[in-house]
Amino acid sequence: MTRTPGFNTLAVHAGAKPDPATGARATPIYQTTSFVFDDADHAASLFGLKAFGNIYTRIMNPTQAVLEERVAALEGGTAALAVASGHAAQVIVFHNLMQPGDNFIAANKLYGGSINQFGHAFKNYGWEVRWADVNDLSTFENQIDDRTKAIFIESLANPGGVFVDIEKIGDIARKHGLPLIVDNTLASPYLVRPIEHGADIVVHSLTKFIGGHGNSIGGVIVDGGTFDWSKSGKYPMMSEPRPEYGGLVLHETFGNFAFAIAARVLGLRDLGPAISPFNAFLILTGLETLPLRMQRHCDNAASVAGWLSNHPKVAWVNYPGLPSDKNNALQKKYSPQGAGAVFTFGLKGGYEAGVKFVEALELFSHLANVGDTKSLVIHPASTTHRQLSDEQKVKAGAGPDTVRLSIGIEDVNDIVADLEQALSKV
């Protein structure tokens, strides 16, 4: 094509060509551990990073490569690395950036699993997280010191459905020479493209809207190609000679996709959380319909949120697409085509009412996931955010009365009918 493909076209075609061996139009599942070298020189070139190619599926696989190229195209990045899960993506990102004794700033509005990973598991690596309030951006800047290595936010926070001001936080990051990492899982690139708003690195749980069907686990790291890893000397993984590769300096050699290369040949190679080719295939298949699904998700969610906001047993609805929502202006700025499909609301009966309501639902599936074609529900305080203190739960938007919904693509009248019958039993 001579013209630049649109988003819908990229979702179907980016990274994929008919299989050269068989002519198969669907991307094949390359279910193999390793790949045959042409000769000794070819093998040496691959291992020395002098040529691109496949060595071992722990590091790279052709099915995985199509997925990576497609997500990078949709996000507007220079390169991507697919891994086993969203959590694995976060570990590898920070492995690229951090040394023992370093810290990073993270928004207080995050998925409960990320709060736990950052606050507990990362301590074992000597990495400190410093929590900042997305409603008071001075708390991001005030905690930065000479050992701070990054700022981490979610574009659309889980579980509260809160849009975060990426551009203003990006300004703070650039002022202090720090990369901005944005988890774009709940928005997906269909709604928000964080790199266009100042992000340097984007991560996803591919398990959610990108895969979209609740059948596969995966994660991805997208390199925005926007950060100078050599300027400050704070990021030796990219800026200093690597003894494993004969003194190669990744940023000098690979330029605006050096972060993605480091994530693959240092992080994924040594830590090992590889995505399976079959999961990569399933996620690719789901990704083709992302624009269609995401718009239906958003349209249904807007209808459901509006209906809930007028129900007498509902205390509050936290959905940025509602004109009355305090986050509505940010939603219109960053995601005018929709406010996402994951949001929370509170029941007047508190914790007990929330549990009873969840158990009364019939169409909704009660499980710990979001971004499925099917409508999903969970009571965060008793499940996903259970490990947090009461104060942390409230700050994360997971108070005792909170119910999280992930609205699917079913007939919206059926979704509302199920909510109505469950509310009648509370």
Question: What feature does the model see in each segment?
Answer:
Residues 2-61, 69-70:
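N-terminal "arm"/small-domain region of PLP-dependent enzymes with the aminotransferase-like
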Residues 2-3, 11-13, 17-20, 79-310:
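Conserved PLP-enzyme active-site core in the AAT-like
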Residues 39-91, 113-121:
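Conserved N-terminal alpha-helix of the aminotransferase class I/II PLP-enzyme fold
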Residues 52, 78, 279, 283, ...:
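Short amphipathic alpha-helical segments
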Residues 76, 147, 313-316, 363, ...:
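Glycine-centered tight turns that cap/initiate beta-strands
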Residues 119-120, 128-130, 146, 166, ...:
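PLP-dependent enzyme catalytic core of the Aspartate aminotransferase-like
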Residues 222, 344-346, 406-408:
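Short hydrophobic/aromatic beta-strand micro-patches
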Residues 271-274, 278-280, 289, 294-296, ...:
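Conserved small-domain helix->loop->beta segment predominantly found in fold-type I
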